[in-house]
UniProtKB/Swiss-Prot annotation:
An N-acylsphing-4-enine binds at residues 466, 487, 524, 572. PANTHER family: CERAMIDE TRANSFER PROTEIN (PTHR19308:SF53), PHOSPHATIDYLCHOLINE TRANSFER PROTEIN (PTHR19308). This is Ceramide transfer protein. One of its GO terms (biological process) is ER to Golgi ceramide transport. The START domain recognizes ceramide and mediates the intermembrane transfer of ceramide. The PH domain targets the Golgi apparatus. Residues 1-11 have a biased composition (Polar residues). A motif (FFAT) lies at residues 320-326. Pfam families: PH, START. Residues 268-302 form a coiled coil. The gene is cert1. Signal peptide: none annotated. PROSITE patterns: PH_DOMAIN (PS50003), START (PS50848). It comes from Xenopus laevis.
């Protein structure tokens, strides 16, 4: 078969390929990752004309789409672990999509791939139709341009090439001259041979008719004279010896010039090789910098994606997780500092209460504010509710074990010590989850145990000192001193958002003797309630106690007790199961940082609030 026939046959085979129909348009509800606050949200997705668009709902399509991407250069990646999820990325834009089930996901992926294959970028037939002749021609032209330009750059090399051109002209002329000389010699020799044969024939006839040797001897001189005119000593005025010397000198000059040219080319090659090595090294550094920049850019563009948040298959490593959490906490601290300074500047000065002063006017009387329930209500035996037994057990356990000194216990580590405050921790892990019990002791002047526990338990002032809560509400009021609270904590990316459902109860434990003060305690422990089921947040489990004892130093003389004479000894214990998949090192670092800050912030708040109020024992 000829080339033309084979070409035509291959072309006909391509023409006979069945053409696929237009891609199928598809629309429906898919879950799309919006951001780390709202998470997955159902969206109406429309696929047509090589474009994927999404709307908030099917009813709002007439208001226009909320976003769209062209599928020509899109990369569709099914998720490795989540069978219902697939990602669509175009440059730095990434859509995270979840279908109802694996079959639903596969149908969407097939439809998207079909639209993509029909575009100019994804079609293989389009790549076959557009051959690579342009690149071949451009490569050939660039090669020829490089070859010619390299000879134009060296001035010495150009001069040597001119010398080679001159030597070539000289050598051609010398070859022509020598060729002419050799042709003349060849013609002369041929003519001499003919005349020599004729003379020899005449001589043979003469000797045959005159057999006398004297004639032969005398005729030899005549024969030498006969051939003198054909001697090629100087043909056409050509000096053979001179031409030979000149030819030798010309070839020697050519060889010398060639040697010089080769030397110049070797030097030039070395120079260009050094420049090439420098350019290769420069390109390597640029490519490395570009790769690092693209990696950082990709991280930033996907920073809020679901693959980079807390989870069993999170792509973020432990160090990056800690850095992100620490950066988020630092931002929150700055915001809290600005808000607290702004709030203090707007606080009105508390007017002094005339009833709260003695005749001397320098000390506060022991008087309970109207907003606080009297102690008799808090220890009333009529405190009946369904969690009463659990509350009593918790109070008894904390009074028995939480007040024990752990300073000499080898299982407890002193992690923070700032003035009167000491924070201890005992490392405990269960199934990879950090369950470290924490115990802190602190001593605060100018406040009583009742005041500290009252502000810690009272939900009306919770937002004044608690900065980690996003929102909370009382689910059920069990009794005057026991409530069930549901609260959601602020999200600290990349950690998942957490919520807590707990029972909070306040108690006063009477002193064993008249010389001792009563002990106040607030117990917060996790419970279940139908009105607060599990949701998208990670439900944490807690068992926390704030135990406060008041110490009084007698004033001099008959003076009344002032806040300068009182001191509150605080014991704070916390057993928290955070749940989720946060790294253990991150949880321990955050606990070490946040618990001391909480104690200092809360006790300072109580001191500020009670400074101008009567003492509440």
């Amino acid at each position: 078969m000829s080339d033309n026939q084979s070409w035509n046959s291959s072309g006909s085979e391509e023409d006979l390929e069945p053409e696929s129909g237009p891609p199928v348009e598809r629309c429906g509800v898919l879950s799309k990752w919006t951001n780390y606050i709202h998470g997955w949200q159902d969206r109406w997705v429309d696929l047509k004309n090589n474009t994927l668009s999404y709307y908030k709902s099917e009813d709002e399509t007439e208001y226009g789409c909320r976003g769209s991407i062209c599928l020509s250069k899109a990369v569709i990646t099914p998720h490795e672990f989540d069978e219902c999820r697939f990602d669509i990325s175009v440059n730095d834009s990434v859509w995270y999509i979840r279908a109802q089930d694996p079959d639903h996901r596969q149908r969407w992926i097939d439809s998207i791939e079909q639209h993509k294959s029909e575009s100019g970028y994804g079609s293989e037939s389009s790549l076959r139709r557009h051959g690579s002749m342009v690149s071949l021609v451009s490569g050939a032209s660039s090669y020829s341009a490089t070859s010619t330009s390299s000879f134009k750059k060296g001035h010495s090399l150009r001069e040597k090439l001119a010398e080679m051109e001159t030597f070539r002209d000289i050598l051609c002329r010398q070859v022509d001259t020598l060729q002419k000389y050799f042709d003349a010699c060849a013609g002369a020799v041929s003519k001499d041979e003919l005349e020599r044969d004729k003379v020899e024939d005449d001589e043979d006839d003469f000797l045959h008719n005159h057999p006398n040797e004297d004639y032969i001897h005398s005729n030899n001189g005549n024969k030498e004279k006969l051939f003198q005119h054909v001697t090629p000593k100087c043909i056409d005025g050509i000096d053979f010896k001179g031409e030979a010397i000149t030819f030798k000198a010309t070839t020697a000059g050519i060889l010398a010039t060639l040697s010089h040219c080769i030397e110049l080319m070797v030097k030039r090659e070395d120079s260009w090789q050094k420049r090439l090595d420098k350019e290769i090294e420069k390109r390597r550094r640029v490519e490395e910098a570009y790769k690092n920049a693209m990696t950082e850019l990709k991280k930033k563009s996907h920073f809020g994606g679901p693959d980079y948040e807390e989870g069993p298959n999170s792509l973020i490593n432990e160090e990056e997780f800690f850095d992100a959490v620490e950066a988020a906490l630092d931002r929150q601290d700055k915001i809290e500092l600005c808000q607290s300074e702004k709030g203090r500047s707007h606080w009105p000065p508390s007017p002094p209460s005339s009833e709260a002063h003695t005749a001397a006017g320098s000390h506060r009387l022991v008087q309970a504010p109207p907003s606080c329930p009297p102690p008799t209500d808090l220890v009333s035996s009529s405190d009946e509710h369904r969690f009463r037994i659990q509350v009593e057990d918790m109070v008894q356990n904390h009074m028995t074990y939480s007040l024990q000194d752990v300073g000499g216990d080898a299982n407890w580590q002193l992690v923070v010590e700032e003035g009167e405050m000491k924070v201890y921790r005992r490392e405990v892990e269960e199934n990879g989850i950090v369950l470290d019990p924490l115990k802190a002791t602190h001593s605060v002047k100018g406040v009583t145990g009742h005041e500290v526990c009252q502000y810690f338990w009272n939900v009306d002032v919770r937002n004044d000192w608690e900065t980690t809560i996003e929102n909370f509400h009382v689910v059920e009021k069990l009794s005057p001193n026991a409530i069930i609270v549901y609260q959601t904590h602020k999200r600290v990316w990349p950690a998942s958002q957490r919520d807590v459902l707990y029972l909070s109860a306040i108690r006063v434990v009477p002193a064993a003797s008249e010389n001792e003060m009563d002990t106040w305690i607030v117990c917060n422990f996790s419970v279940d309630h139908d009105k607060a089921p599990l949701n998208r947040c990670v439900r944490a489990k807690i068992n926390i106690a704030m135990i406060c004892q008041t110490l009084v130093s007698p004033p001099e003389g008959n003076k009344e007790i002032s806040r300068d004479n009182i001191q509150c000894k605080i014991t704070y214990v916390a057993n928290v199961n955070p749940g989720g998949w946060a790294p253990a090192s991150v949880l321990r670092a955050v606990a070490k940082r946040e618990y001391p800050k909480f104690l200092k912030r809360f006790t300072s708040y109580v001191q500020e609030k009670t400074a101008d109020k009567p003492i509440l024992f």
